[in-house]
């Protein structure tokens, strides 16, 4: 990465380090592009979009808070803070789990579903421009296979 010292990658070959930093830079760039356009066009941060999308794909469009945090790849505290903002804006609603009153569910509201549908067009457009337009179907198959292997090899996989 920019400004990295030689000591930061003493255990990696230059090509290994370059591959790693290229992946990080691509990820950061695409997320920044998504975040900027989602905020400008829909008033949603990319993390908010991700939570709405995660809820939309869940059974009954609702999840417990810990499941939502896990699936959205957020910390529990970050999820609580984000859900509070989304609830204030009427995009989600929280309710107590009737089976265990210590737990909470978060559900996508109709307003949240409409906001998500509108934002999905922007999300798709950015991904088309920054990823799909510059990769072939064969490239994407290869990347998908590679990412699956990397995910399975990760200690936190599963």
Can you annotate each of these PLM segments?
Residues 2-7, 84-141:
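Charged, amphipathic alpha-helical coiled-coil/dimerization segments
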Residues 1-14, 137-158:
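C-terminal regulatory/oligomerization modules of transcriptional regulators
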Residues 15, 47-49, 111, 139:
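N-terminal positioning helix adjacent to the helix-turn-helix/winged-helix DNA-binding module
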């Amino acid at each position: 990465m920019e400004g990295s010292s030689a000591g930061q990658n003493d255990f990696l070959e230059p090509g290994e380090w370059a591959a790693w930093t290229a992946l990080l830079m691509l990820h950061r760039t695409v997320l920044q592009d998504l975040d900027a356009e989602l905020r400008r066009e829909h008033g949603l941060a990319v993390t908010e979009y991700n939570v709405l999308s995660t809820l939309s794909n869940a059974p009954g469009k609702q999840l417990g808070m810990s499941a939502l945090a896990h699936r959205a790849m957020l910390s529990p505290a970050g999820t609580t803070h984000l859900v509070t903002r989304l609830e204030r804006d009427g995009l989600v609603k929280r309710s107590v789990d009737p089976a265990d009153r210590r737990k909470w569910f978060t559900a996508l509201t109709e307003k949240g579903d409409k906001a998500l549908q509108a934002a999905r067009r922007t999300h798709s457009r950015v991904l088309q421009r920054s990823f799909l337009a510059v990769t072939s179907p064969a490239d994407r198959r290869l990347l998908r296979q590679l990412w699956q292997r990397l995910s399975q090899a990760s200690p936190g996989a599963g």
